[in-house]
Amino acid sequence: MVRVVASSVRGPSHVRDGLPCQDAGLAVADSRASIAVVCDGLGSRPDSKAGSRAATLAARDAWRLWRRSPVGSGEDLIRLVEVAWRLRLQGTPPDAAATTCLIYAEDGHGRAVLAQLGDGLIARRGSDGSVAVHPARTDGFGLTHALGAPHTLADWSFALSAPLAPGDALVLATDGVSEDLEPGRLGDLACWIIDDLASRPGAGRQLAHELRNWPVPRHQDDKTLLVMWKPCNPSSK
């Protein structure tokens, strides 16, 4: 069984302005297949909070259907997410609820998909300590791709992978976190959460405290960080 520690917090600018957190995260740790999602509602859109929350739920909805088949592709999962997101929005216009979407999803048939639309980070640390960062795609003009903003399937960055093996860990983060992380320290971040934070009572609350007290001067953005890992010993952390 995999384990998860995750938290989303408002950034100082939203605290100051009395606005809600526009990030969202979700994880399902299942004995056969797991999913992890983080989303960042675009701050320029009036319903971005609803958009990011709907995207996490849509990813879960899509995953539950997609994992039933041993032959579903990464493209199939993404198409399901796109449709499910619009259904989850109900009467909210998609362009008012634009959000990034980063997904790790296992199908229970020996495969996993990494999928990313927009900025943020998906990184995987192997049991040997190696770290691989999933490549994001940009439009080249400093704008981020997002659900609810003009994009195509080709704007998603996605790849098939093996599911998490014992000792592996996955890090998903919105840009409020990822932009301040040093690539060479991603493995250390995962180790800190797994070996230190996860052993404390209320690990999610402890992580939220760390995110609110982010050690970068003048940080402003909402922050979401999710770490999912598969212990080497099922009875250990």
What are these regions (language model features)?
Residues 38, 117, 173:
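Generic enzyme active-site microenvironment
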Residues 88, 152-237:
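C-terminal catalytic subdomain
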Residues 18-31, 94-107, 113, 138-182:
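Acidic loop->beta-strand submotif enriched in PP2C/PPM serine/threonine phosphatases
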Residues 1-24, 28, 78-87, 94, ...:
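Short glycine- and acidic-rich boundary segments immediately preceding or forming the N-terminal edge
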Residues 46-47, 124-125, 180-182:
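Short helix/loop capping segments that flank catalytic or ligand/cofactor-binding pockets
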Residues 1-61, 120, 153, 157-161, ...:
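N-terminal entry segment of metal-dependent catalytic domains or homologous docking segments
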Residues 69-125, 155-162, 217, 228:
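Catalytic core of PPM/PP2C metal-dependent serine/threonine phosphatase domains
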Residues 66-78, 195-203:
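Short, charged, surface-exposed loops that flank catalytic or proteolytic processing sites
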